[in-house]
């Protein structure tokens, strides 16, 4: 254990020459390392606090569990893989569906807990059996569609917030876009956070912010924890999120490998297990589910500091913020107009991540099988198809996921059996 928390000081610990990098098992001086850790908190914060705000979860509780999950992640991978675990946007749709049905946060927490357990189980399987079977079950056309529908299914909820205060929503959205295109480096990557701050300031001027809860909140205190309430009927809404979390974690590991020049393929199973365990714990205590964050890859790309020590500092800062109820109360005052503006971009970007999976993997939509199963899945999600069977509810995401998995593999098997699909066709995996 003592070796686990021993990092070699890089150079003089203070300065870095152009192009020089700090490896995961190295660190700068602790003040410099803490500075990098603070940058990681700022980078992840814009996305992390939006998830509880949009779903009705407590921001302080969610932040607390992101800190715990990050620490757990680093412990499990023995400080080899630098990552921060923030709130996953994949949970917004199923949580919203549950709360809209008046089943409450406790029931949604059960869905998060089970999702985490399933992800941890997949992590164990990948660790011992490899990740090839994931590619077989979820080829790019399937993987991309599932990720895309998580975002596009949320489009109606964006409008519900947007129409409350269209002027504030537009100001927020324009601010996010301008920061993204006018600034480079860390500031440009903080476009969501800065845009929300600008939109919030505008909302304050317009008298759209209720500050009453801030004065009643204490400066120091524990977050609000609550136990999950068992309800198996909501699980079909959450199970598809497991596939999204698998895709996010695998993509994250490969991105870090490419950036650091290290082969982290042997860490994929560990990453999935650690994120699954963190999500399970969060669900047990009333926090939102977690995932590895691309925002923090941006910080590493900008600073060239890959030290896992910086992520321990980030987890520490996040923990301290979660223990300030007044801070959580401030976050809860963000008005609907601001949320409508920022989610217009965010939910669309989640959907476009799925499209990017298609593009990067050169999915051939000249093949009828590929384009038909993708088209059906997208319409099911965007149209928000829904039905119930024996008391179990299926929303657009659950139905779309089932349809594309069954349709793709079923039709592929029929096509290959009848000879209409070449068994060696590289475009039909």
Regions found by a protein language model. Name each.
Residues 32-46, 168-172, 190-191, 206, ...:
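Hydrophobic, membrane-embedded alpha-helices of multi-pass small-molecule transporters
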Residues 102-212, 320-422:
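Membrane-embedded alpha-helical modules
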Residues 12, 17, 45-46, 174-179, ...:
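Juxtamembrane interface elements at the cytosolic ends of transmembrane helices
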Residues 1-35, 211-224, 258-261, 271, ...:
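Intrinsically disordered, low-complexity non-transmembrane regions of multi-pass membrane transporters
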């Amino acid at each position: 254990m003592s070796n686990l928390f021993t990092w070699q000081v890089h150079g003089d610990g203070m300065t870095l020459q152009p192009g020089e990098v700090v490896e995961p098992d190295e660190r700068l001086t602790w003040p410099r390392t803490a500075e990098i850790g603070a940058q990681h908190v700022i980078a992840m914060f814009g996305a992390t606090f939006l998830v509880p705000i949009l779903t009705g979860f407590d921001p302080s509780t969610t932040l607390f569990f992101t800190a715990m999950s990050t620490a757990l992640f680093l412990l499990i991978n023995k400080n080899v893989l630098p990552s921060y675990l923030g709130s996953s946007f994949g949970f917004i749709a199923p949580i919203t569906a549950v709360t809209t049905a008046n089943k409450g946060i406790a029931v949604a927490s059960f869905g998060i807990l089970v999702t985490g357990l399933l992800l941890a189980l997949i992590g164990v399987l990948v660790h011992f059996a490899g990740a090839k079977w994931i590619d077989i079950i979820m080829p790019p056309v399937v993987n991309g569609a599932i990720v895309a529908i998580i975002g596009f299914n949320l489009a109606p909820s964006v409008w519900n917030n947007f129409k409350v205060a269209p002027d504030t929503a537009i100001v927020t959205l324009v601010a996010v876009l301008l920061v993204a295109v006018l600034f480079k480096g860390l500031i440009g990557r903080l476009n969501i956070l800065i845009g929300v701050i600008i939109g919030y300031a505008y909302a304050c001027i317009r008298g759209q912010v209720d500050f009453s809860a801030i004065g009643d909140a204490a400066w120091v205190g524990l977050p609000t924890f609550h136990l999950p309430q068992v309800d198996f009927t909501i699980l079909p809404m959450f199970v598809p999120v497991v596939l999204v979390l698998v895709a996010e974690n695998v993509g994250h590991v490969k991105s870090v490998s490419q950036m650091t020049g290290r082969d982290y393929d042997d860490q994929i199973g560990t990453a999935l297990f650690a994120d699954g365990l963190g999500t399970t714990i969060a669900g047990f205590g009333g926090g939102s589910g977690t995932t590895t964050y691309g925002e923090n890859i941006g910080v590493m790309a900008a600073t060239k500091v890959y030290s896992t020590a910086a992520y321990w500092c980030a987890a520490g800062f996040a923990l301290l913020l979660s223990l300030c109820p007044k801070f959580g109360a401030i976050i809860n005052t963000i008005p609907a107009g601001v949320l409508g503006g920022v989610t217009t971009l965010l939910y669309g970007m989640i959907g476009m991540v799925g499209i990017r999976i298609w593009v990067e993997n050169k999915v051939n939509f000249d093949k009828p099988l590929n384009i038909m199963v993708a088209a059906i899945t997208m319409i099911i999600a965007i149209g928000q198809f829904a039905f119930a069977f024996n008391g179990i509810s299926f929303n657009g995401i659950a139905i779309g996921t089932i349809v594309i998995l069954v349709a793709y593999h079923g039709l592929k098997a029929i096509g290959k059996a009848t000879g209409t699909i070449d068994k060696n066709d590289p475009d039909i995996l």
